[in-house]
Amino acid sequence: MLQVYLVRHGETQWNAERRIQGQSDSPLTAKGEQQAMQVATRAKELGITHIISSDLGRTRRTVEIIAQACGCDIIFDSRLRELNMGVLEKSHIDSLTEEEENWRRQLVNGTVDGRIPEGESMQELSDRVNAALESCRDLPQGSRPLLVSHGIALGCLVSTILGLPAWAERRLRLRNCSISRVDYQESLWLSSGWVVETAGDISHLDAPALDELQR
């Protein structure tokens, strides 16, 4: 059985400011750095053998801290990037016009083919993050990889493993530096393939983590 751990990046300046990030970037806050150190301690205990990360700046900084603790090399994979949120990136969430807010709500309320102008659909996001997960099956026997990505991206990944459409209503809370685990297995009582073991664990963090749409 292959166990794959999923981690969302640490808190960023724009998370704290309620700005929409998408594939734009802002640095980790001091709290985000602390979260990364705490998840790094947990990752070392888990015996992580490979670290695979989105190549955006906030995930890069998070995995630098994790890799120091685990002694693992880092593989950067652009398929693990956050949803491209088009013309809304960098916007303060409270400054959106009614039209812009309607675009944003499409990503939350389960709109088939919902898309922010110049951005991605949830199906496009799902296709690439699931492909990145499938690549873990090519790792050597006994590997225990850690994938570091983003809130909407990881939420979409876990939800589609559960059998939901990529564009389904967003009802899974994955806070900064939360840990989820998915397993690839053959089972008598579960559908063969990927299954969700845990989602959104924050027991390793010593302070509340933000839960904002901007990722």
Swiss-Prot record:
Catalytic reaction equation(s): (2R)-2-phosphoglycerate = (2R)-3-phosphoglycerate
Record's GO cellular component terms: cytoplasm
PANTHER family xrefs: BROAD-SPECIFICITY PHOSPHATASE YOR283W-RELATED, HISTIDINE PHOSPHATASE FAMILY PROTEIN-RELATED
Lineage summary: Bacteria, Pseudomonadati, Pseudomonadota, Gammaproteobacteria, Enterobacterales
Similarity comment: Belongs to the phosphoglycerate mutase family. GpmB subfamily.
Active site as annotated: H9 (tele-phosphohistidine intermediate), E82 (proton donor/acceptor)
Enzyme class (EC, first level): isomerase
The protein's name in its UniProt record: Probable phosphoglycerate mutase GpmB
Positions bearing the site annotation: Transition state stabilizer: H150
GO biological process, one term: glycolytic process
Statement: the UniProt record of this protein carries the keyword Chaperone: no
GO molecular-function terms, A-Z: phosphatase activity; phosphoglycerate mutase activity
Binding-site residues, substrate: 8-15, 21-22, 58, 60, 82-85, 104-105, 151-152
CDD domains: HP_PGM_like
Enzyme Commission numbers on file: 5.4.2.-
Any single Pfam family the record assigns to this protein: His_Phos_1
Domain of life of the native organism: Bacteria
Gene this protein is translated from: gpmB
Pathway(s) of this molecule: Carbohydrate degradation; glycolysis; pyruvate from D-glyceraldehyde 3-phosphate: step 3/5
Presence of keyword Ribosomal protein: no
Keywords: Glycolysis, Isomerase
